[in-house]
Amino acid sequence: IGLFAFLREAGVWGPVLIVAPLSTLGNWVSEFQKWCPSIEVLKYHGTREQRKSLRAALEEETTMMRAKVVVTSYEMVRMDSHAFAAREWFYIVIDEGHRLKNNECQLMQCLFTFAHSPNTSRLILTGTPLQVCRAHLLSPRTT
């Protein structure tokens, strides 16, 4: 959160996607509200109908300008990857990054569909040693 506050203050800023376990989504939102209340955060999670309205909101120009951080779960990335692929991300953060087992895991396959832009930076957060070998993280599909 501090990184994004710094980047925003430095004028180096764009849409951020944070992919995290469902149980931590509320914590991400509340921590942004606590430490960087000027950064608007959108929690992307819910029923099919709720997600449909969230997707419509993301497509609106005004929402895209305001909601600079979108917090979602691994499951939502897999289910609605097309919605995330429609937007160019400045940063993609993967919380609990040890979930990225290899290039063939479902989450990695979904991330490949919309994290391919050379302008997108990626950040993996984990407290557990990664199971992915360095070659997978640095492969042409992930850079």
Residue ranges and their predicted role:
Residues 1-143:
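ASCE P-loop NTPase motor core, strongest for the SF2 helicase catalytic module
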